Amino acid sequence: MNITDVGHLVSDADDGEDKLEKWARLESCSARDIAKKYEELFLSDIAELNIDRFDVMPRATDHIAEQIAIVQTLENKGYTYTIEGDGMYMDTSKISDYGKLMWPNYKKRLADLNAWERVEMKGKKNPTDFALWKFSPTNTQRQMERDSPRGKGFPGRHIECSAMATKYLGERFDIHHGGSDHITIHHTNEIAQSECCFDHKPWVNYRLHNEFLQVDGGKMSKSLWNTYSLKDIKDRGFSPLDLRYFYFKAQYTNFLNFTREALTQAKNERLGLIKKIKNLIQNQDSLSSVDADLQNKFDQALGDNLNTPKLLTQLHIALSEPHVNTLDIVKTLEEKVLKIRLFSSDDSSDLDIPEQIMVLAEQRKQAKADKNYALADQIRTELASYWREIKDTKDGFELIKN
């Protein structure tokens, strides 16, 4: 997995402001500080989600030389042209199968898309041409810029992936993964520059594209104020592993709709599996028959393009109708694939009320004692945002998950 810390502009167009520099300005810090902050948050979150740490996580800023080398190779082969004062571009008209990732009928689709959302910049020969290297604006110093044979500048948004992937995986490799939104532009341009540079077709043998998490049936977006961090999930009384289980409920090629009810159901299902395993351990001696096909059922689900919903279905069936070999096979599945603490001896942490919620509840209790009912109502509303309802009792209060 590579880490982008330079070169991504605010849109798919080849002009505008670098995203990191934009957020650095908004948060009054450097672009490197922004990159480091969110890299550390990301690594912390994936650790809590029991996602294995990647063997190599290269950063774009550490591989500028490799990116420049690819640009130079493409220039030497005659695939590029320069727009004065702007940058060096890939001439997609020289690539006979440009856009093939959009098969079937990619040439027709590409023609339709030539009047599409790709902004046509002054000087571009074709709407689908894309920047390999951007020149730094005159009399303007960017935080993230480097020297190159063509002067100071910064890489286009696609070149870093080709550079880092080929450095660590070779000029041709098996699996490339990314979001479905990258098919028409980012991954299409990666293929174009990489196959022209390294003369390997296909550059990648298999491409996996995931769909996205939605919220309440709609797009998840910061502009819509409907995003959730892992901290938000924990503050609402859920374990990161409840969220991990929730993700398994949709195959990666399908959209997954995030709602409070769906996450609650995922939590209940996970805790239900834990209870079934505890019962199975206690009653193991009473079992006699063997399910000779159980391992194959799990393997078939995973072999069906990582069909995790099918895998969960087989898991629930296996634990509802246990056999002598069920426990060992499920334990292997848990250790190698699921990693959701199914064999945990203590799941009390899943039932704890987060400290932040308890603090709010105590503050509301004090507000009522002080007859500050406006503040008490305000805190009640805030608790509702954490999916908690507070009920007054003779001894104080009771918190109910709603």
Which stretches of residues belong to each language-model region?
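Short catalytic-loop micro-motif centered on adjacent basic/acidic residues
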Residues: 54-58, 176-178, 324
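Surface-exposed helix-capping loop/turn segments at secondary-structure junctions
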Residues: 48-55, 80, 172, 279-288
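Alpha-helical recognition segments enriched in aromatics with Gly/Pro capping
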Residues: 43-44, 65-279
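Non-catalytic interaction-recognition regions
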Residues: 29-33, 43-69, 77-79, 183, ...
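N-terminal, positively charged nucleic-acid-binding surface of large information/translation enzymes
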Residues: 1-50, 390-399
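Structural preference for alpha-helix termini/caps and helix-kink/transition segments
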Residues: 219-222, 226-402
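Short, glycine/charge-rich beta-strand/loop segments that flank catalytic centers
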Residues: 3-8, 39-42, 52-67, 85-94
